[in-house]
Swiss-Prot record:
It is an enzyme of class 2 (transferase). It comes from Shewanella amazonensis (strain ATCC BAA-1098 / SB2B). Its cofactor is Mg(2+). The chain crosses the membrane at residues 26-46, 74-94, 97-117, 132-152, 168-188, 199-219, 236-256, 263-283, 288-308, 338-358. This is Phospho-N-acetylmuramoyl-pentapeptide-transferase. It holds the Pfam family MraY_sig1.
């Protein structure tokens, strides 16, 4: 929004031209989202406590989690508000990339909000019925998939980038819609499954978003894109603003979500952030790279799939409890140890993913 004001004021003072640089606006978006989250966090937590919007804890979960019962949840509203303000203030609102991301964050955030509302306000332990949650997620993801496919402006927008192979860039055709759908819905639910310990989901999300900020910047510059053998995507630089806003809002939320958490993000946060990461991966053509950099999310999801599959097929469980972070808790690991070690794994995987840009 302010980029247009700065563009107008440039004719009176050339110093305003600095706002035309994506990197400068990205820093401002990060700081804006961060400061908003830090400023409004205590107010939101206090309000949630007054409204008695507290976390519902499973009776069959680790005993250490019983003390979390009643901790304010739906803190994802703080994250989303910070992201929206950062993007709307410093993003180029003429960019379709920006509006796609705002739609994804808003739609998946609404799905998560309804789920949280039913759980903590209406005291329905099941929340939004899984079938309807999946249907709503699918509808939102398909809207994005069809829009992106039929609004393609550059061949690189529908290519599949395969890490380590610079000459393998197949055109996906209609498979683009299928891949986009599964990437967005899969990432949304993967982050949701990971959000089971204090700060466990938000820090890997911040790391992956920061990495995608760099990738979006490189993809938007023809020289860098050609050098790294990745698709050149004109205008993708605006995704840097979205990514840094996610980083800022995420770090601000982590201030209150770190162990022992004062607030949880709830589904309103985890579903929307996961969908956002999936959409960014699609927009910069790095779906496979998301699997690498978001390896913690993949690991958590696979542990649930394997646990359910093993129990149904063999009548035996592989892990003491799934997702896998609960397995380590039941083995006796203190919660902070599980969290930090998963953070370290996430950092390693993000750096590995970035390294693949050069290892081709």
């Amino acid at each position: 929004m302010l980029v247009y004001l700065a563009e107008y004021l440039t004719q009176f003072y050339t110093g305003f031209n600095v706002f035309s640089y994506v990197t400068f606006r990205a820093i401002l978006a990060l700081l804006t989202a961060l400061m908003f989250s830090l400023w409004w966090g205590p107010k939101l937590i206090e309000r949630l406590q007054v409204l008695q919007i507290g976390q519902v804890v499973r009776n069959d979960g680790p005993e250490s989690h019983f003390s979390k019962r009643g901790t304010p949840t739906m803190g994802g509203l703080l994250i989303l508000a910070g992201i929206f303000i950062g993007v709307l203030l410093w993003g180029d609102l003429g960019s379709r990339y920006v509006w796609v991301m705002l739609f994804v964050l808003g739609s998946f955030g609404l799905i998560g909000f309804i789920d949280d509302y039913r759980k903590v306000v209406r005291k329905d332990p099941k929340g939004l019925i899984a079938r309807w949650k999946y249907i709503f997620q699918s509808l939102a993801a398909l809207v994005v998939a069809f829009y992106l496919f039929y609004s393609t402006k550059h061949p690189g927008e529908t290519q599949l980038v395969v890490p380590f192979f610079k000459d393998i860039l197949p055109q996906l055709g209609l498979m683009f819609i299928v891949l986009t759908y599964f990437t967005i819905v899969g990432a949304s639910n993967a982050v949701n499954l990971t959000d089971g310990l204090d700060g466990l989901a938000i820090m890997p999300t911040v790391m992956v978003a920061a990495a995608f900020a760099l990738i979006a910047y490189l993809s938007g510059h023809v020289q860098f894109a050609n050098y790294l053998h990745i698709p050149y995507l004109p205008g993708s630089g605006e995704l840097v603003i979205v990514c840094t806003a996610i980083v800022g809002a995420g770090l601000g939320f982590l201030w209150f979500n770190t162990y022992p958490a004062q607030v949880f993000m709830g589904d309103v946060g985890s579903l929307s952030l996961g969908a956002a990461l999936g959409t960014i991966a699609v927009l910069v053509r790095q779906e496979i790279l998301l699997v690498i950099m978001g390896g913690v999310f993949v690991m958590e999801t696979l542990s649930v799939i394997l646990q359910v599959g093993s129990y149904k097929l063999r009548g035996q469980r592989i892990f003491r409890m799934a997702p896998i972070h609960h397995h380590y808790e039941l083995k006796g690991w203190p919660e902070p140890r599980v969290i930090v070690r998963f953070w370290i794994i996430s950092l390693f995987l993000v750096l590995l993913g970035l390294a693949t840009l050069k290892l081709r």
